[in-house]
């Protein structure tokens, strides 16, 4: 298994996804607006509620309302966790599989995790070489969180929570029940980025810093070129070589190439 500095680890998706850039040549989060007022009750009641959530997560107006209403958003996340076991599994019904994918989307779209995924995919599509890692990192971190530690922390927490759902999904045997308006290509690219962020946290916790919160703080310092960060020189294993079994299942379900 290869090893590299933590700084380089933040751009591993550029190498992982470069081989499937044509496959990922779309914006996973771009959709027409379908305004709706989000209420927890709208999303309860089994398949119908999940279909409503899938539709609403495709609406920038509804997503903006969810961002502005953390009480409803947290209640919805909790509902998906307790009703469908999206972070723990087993995801042994089509509704549970769909709910896990929607849970990941909910967390990413109500933080800046969606923009991070899109920026990484854009870098894959436009970069001809990796070159200056600091420049690459600056280009993929969303502008609204790059200098805002509260926003950066929310984005990271969202990615870590989404990773739990993607790992639970990939622990099941494909094919999967994909929500309306979503593709397994969407899921694969988001799952890869979410897993990467969990891998970075795992690599520096507790060996460098004691808690996940501390790890996120150090990552914030790193992306802002703060010389007080403790992780820029840390050597860590490439989390995508080999690809872990849940991600392998997700990539296989998407028909996406990946390291063997």
Where on the chain are the PLM-derived regions?
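N-terminal alpha-helical interaction modules that lie
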Residues: 21-260
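Bacterial N-terminal signal peptides that target proteins for export
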Residues: 1-8
């Amino acid at each position: 298994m290869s090893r590299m500095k933590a700084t380089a680890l933040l751009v591993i998706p550029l190498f992982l996804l470069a081989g499937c850039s044509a496959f990922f040549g779309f914006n996973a989060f771009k959709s027409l607006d379908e305004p709706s007022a989000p209420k927890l009750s709208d999303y309860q009641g089994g398949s119908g509620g999940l279909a409503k959530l899938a539709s609403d997560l495709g609406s920038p107006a509804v997503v903006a309302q969810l961002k502005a209403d953390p009480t409803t958003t947290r209640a919805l996340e909790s509902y998906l966790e307790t009703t469908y076991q999206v972070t723990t599994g087993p995801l042994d019904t089509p509704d549970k599989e769909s709910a896990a994918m929607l849970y990941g989307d909910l967390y990413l779209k109500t933080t800046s995790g969606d923009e991070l995924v899109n920026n990484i995919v854009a870098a894959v599509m436009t970069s001809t070489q990796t070159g200056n890692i600091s420049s690459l990192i600056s280009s993929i971190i969303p502008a609204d969180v790059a200098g805002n530690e509260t926003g950066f922390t929310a984005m990271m927490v969202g990615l870590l929570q989404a990773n739990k759902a993607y790992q639970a999904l990939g622990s099941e045997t494909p094919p999967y029940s994909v929500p309306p308006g979503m593709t397994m290509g969407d899921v694969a690219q988001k799952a890869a980025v979410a897993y990467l962020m969990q891998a970075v946290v795992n690599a520096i916790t507790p060996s460098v810093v004691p808690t996940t919160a501390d790890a996120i703080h150090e990552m914030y310092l790193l992306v802002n070129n703060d010389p007080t960060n403790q992780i820029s020189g840390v050597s860590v294993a490439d989390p995508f070589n080999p690809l872990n079994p849940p991600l392998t299942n997700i990539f296989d379900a998407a028909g996406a190439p990946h390291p063997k």
